[in-house]
């Protein structure tokens, strides 16, 4: 596995997040220095093309929207704001040429740090979910050239992380009798040690807490819903309690979740699935990344340690 290191990031303080766009040609980074930097990646080389300024505190998270909505980046910060940035292409026939970045939306209804932002699967629409230390989740939607929002209480002691389920329900691709089409659901992780699953009700136009998953004994730092849409749903959660839990639900009994616990020697910060949804990457306080995979018996095994 080749690693490319960007040593001259240009940030003045700690970098908190980095994300590649859909095509792997742009990298966005964000930092305690209150800025976001956009790099163009070509092979082994990279070039800083833009520095975005607008936040008044450390920027925790950056997330690229699907390119069908344009070149759009969301960011969230300690300042309680979610900002949406868009690149305006000068030359419509050659988007690679790049254009000017502008802030197109400033969402500032949260009363504390916004810790994470996550775009929904593009099939569901241009939807951004935001997790805040004020205990609330907001969902922003861009439709008919304007932004609307919903905001609701989720976890009493603050929301640390949020992750959308795939748009297709598990088993729907291989079922002879598929259920309804696009689902809008996500999972949140909180400082109350809980995971909560939220489902959108199109009749009431609200997100409702349909399931609460208990098992961690300390803050849930990160949650990640696997993109796999085969016969099972998987959610991974990383906690301050030095464990990762992998929660599994079978398509034949979608309301029933079981969990398997993976134990570590350090607090855990992030969990991330491979694009196919069968390999889980875990990172924690020891600056190591480990990769995990389910064996034929349904047990999760470590397949690799990645150390710099």
Curated annotation (Swiss-Prot):
<feature type="repeat" description="WD 2">
    <location>
        <begin position="54"/>
        <end position="95"/>
    </location>
</feature>
<keyword id="KW-0968">Cytoplasmic vesicle</keyword>
<dbReference type="GO" id="GO:0006606">
    <property type="term" value="P:protein import into nucleus"/>
</dbReference>
<feature type="repeat" description="WD 4">
    <location>
        <begin position="154"/>
        <end position="208"/>
    </location>
</feature>
<comment type="subunit">
    <text>The COPII coat is composed of at least 5 proteins: the sec23/24 complex, the sec13/31 complex, and the protein sar1. Component of the nuclear pore complex (NPC). NPC constitutes the exclusive means of nucleocytoplasmic transport. NPCs allow the passive diffusion of ions and small molecules and the active, nuclear transport receptor-mediated bidirectional transport of macromolecules such as proteins, RNAs, ribonucleoparticles (RNPs), and ribosomal subunits across the nuclear envelope. Due to its 8-fold rotational symmetry, all subunits are present with 8 copies or multiples thereof.</text>
</comment>
<comment type="function">
    <text>Component of the coat protein complex II (COPII) which promotes the formation of transport vesicles from the endoplasmic reticulum (ER). The coat has two main functions, the physical deformation of the endoplasmic reticulum membrane into vesicles and the selection of cargo molecules. It also functions as a component of the nuclear pore complex (NPC). NPC components, collectively referred to as nucleoporins (NUPs), can play the role of both NPC structural components and of docking or interaction partners for transiently associated nuclear transport factors.</text>
</comment>
<dbReference type="InterPro" id="IPR037363">
    <property type="entry name" value="Sec13/Seh1_fam"/>
</dbReference>
<feature type="repeat" description="WD 6">
    <location>
        <begin position="263"/>
        <end position="302"/>
    </location>
</feature>
<dbReference type="GO" id="GO:0051028">
    <property type="term" value="P:mRNA transport"/>
</dbReference>
<dbReference type="GO" id="GO:0070863">
    <property type="term" value="P:positive regulation of protein exit from endoplasmic reticulum"/>
</dbReference>
<dbReference type="GO" id="GO:0045893">
    <property type="term" value="P:positive regulation of DNA-templated transcription"/>
</dbReference>
<comment type="similarity">
    <text>Belongs to the WD repeat SEC13 family.</text>
</comment>
<keyword id="KW-0472">Membrane</keyword>
<keyword id="KW-0256">Endoplasmic reticulum</keyword>
<keyword id="KW-0813">Transport</keyword>
<dbReference type="InterPro" id="IPR001680">
    <property type="entry name" value="WD40_rpt"/>
</dbReference>
<dbReference type="GO" id="GO:0032527">
    <property type="term" value="P:protein exit from endoplasmic reticulum"/>
</dbReference>
<keyword id="KW-0653">Protein transport</keyword>
<keyword id="KW-0931">ER-Golgi transport</keyword>
<keyword id="KW-0677">Repeat</keyword>
<keyword id="KW-0811">Translocation</keyword>
<keyword id="KW-0539">Nucleus</keyword>
<protein>
    <recommendedName>
        <fullName>Protein transport protein sec13</fullName>
    </recommendedName>
</protein>
<feature type="repeat" description="WD 3">
    <location>
        <begin position="109"/>
        <end position="150"/>
    </location>
</feature>
<feature type="repeat" description="WD 5">
    <location>
        <begin position="215"/>
        <end position="257"/>
    </location>
</feature>
<dbReference type="InterPro" id="IPR015943">
    <property type="entry name" value="WD40/YVTN_repeat-like_dom_sf"/>
</dbReference>
<dbReference type="GO" id="GO:0005198">
    <property type="term" value="F:structural molecule activity"/>
</dbReference>
<dbReference type="GO" id="GO:0090114">
    <property type="term" value="P:COPII-coated vesicle budding"/>
</dbReference>
<dbReference type="GO" id="GO:0005789">
    <property type="term" value="C:endoplasmic reticulum membrane"/>
</dbReference>
<dbReference type="GO" id="GO:0051664">
    <property type="term" value="P:nuclear pore localization"/>
</dbReference>
<dbReference type="GO" id="GO:1902953">
    <property type="term" value="P:positive regulation of ER to Golgi vesicle-mediated transport"/>
</dbReference>
<keyword id="KW-0906">Nuclear pore complex</keyword>
<dbReference type="GO" id="GO:0036503">
    <property type="term" value="P:ERAD pathway"/>
</dbReference>
<dbReference type="GO" id="GO:1904263">
    <property type="term" value="P:positive regulation of TORC1 signaling"/>
</dbReference>
<dbReference type="InterPro" id="IPR020472">
    <property type="entry name" value="G-protein_beta_WD-40_rep"/>
</dbReference>
<dbReference type="Pfam" id="PF00400">
    <property type="entry name" value="WD40"/>
</dbReference>
<dbReference type="GO" id="GO:0031080">
    <property type="term" value="C:nuclear pore outer ring"/>
</dbReference>
<keyword id="KW-0853">WD repeat</keyword>
<dbReference type="GO" id="GO:0030127">
    <property type="term" value="C:COPII vesicle coat"/>
</dbReference>
<dbReference type="InterPro" id="IPR036322">
    <property type="entry name" value="WD40_repeat_dom_sf"/>
</dbReference>
<feature type="repeat" description="WD 1">
    <location>
        <begin position="10"/>
        <end position="49"/>
    </location>
</feature>
<keyword id="KW-0509">mRNA transport</keyword>
């Amino acid at each position: 596995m080749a690693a490319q290191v960007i040593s001259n990031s240009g940030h003045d303080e700690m970098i908190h997040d980095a994300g590649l766009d859909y095509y792997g040609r742009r990298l966005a980074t964000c930092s305690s220095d209150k800025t976001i930097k956009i790099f163009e990646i070509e092979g082994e080389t990279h070039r800083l093309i833009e520095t975005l300024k607008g936040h008044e505190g450390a920027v925790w998270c950056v997330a690229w929207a699907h390119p069908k909505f344009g070149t759009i980046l969301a960011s969230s910060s300690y300042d309680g704001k979610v900002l949406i940035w868009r690149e305006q292409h000068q030359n419509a026939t050659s988007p690679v040429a790049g254009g000017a970045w502008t802030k197109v939306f400033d969402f500032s209804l949260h009363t504390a740090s916004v810790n994470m932002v996550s775009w929904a699967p593009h099939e569901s629409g241009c939807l951004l979910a935001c997790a805040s230390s004020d205990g609330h989740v907001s969902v922003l939607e861009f439709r008919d050239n304007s932004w609307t929002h919903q905001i609701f209480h989720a976890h009493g002691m603050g929301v640390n992380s949020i992750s959308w389920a795939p748009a297709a329900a598990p088993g729907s691709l291989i079922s002879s009798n598929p259920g309804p089409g696009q689902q809008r659901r996500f999972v949140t992780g909180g400082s109350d040690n809980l995971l909560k699953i939220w489902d959108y009700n199109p009749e009431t136009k609200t997100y409702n807490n349909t399931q609460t998953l208990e098992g961690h004994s300390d803050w849930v730092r990160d949650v990640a819903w696997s993109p796999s849409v085969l016969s099972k749903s998987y959610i991974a959660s990383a906690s301050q309690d030095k464990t990762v839990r992998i929660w599994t639900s079978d398509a034949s009994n979608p309301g029933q979740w079981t969990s398997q616990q993976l134990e570590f020697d350090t607090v855990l910060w992030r969990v991330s699935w491979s694009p196919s949804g069968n390999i889980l990457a875990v990172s924690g306080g020891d600056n190591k990344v480990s990769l995990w995979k389910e064996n034929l018996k349904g047990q999760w095994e470590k397949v690799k340690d990645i150390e710099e």
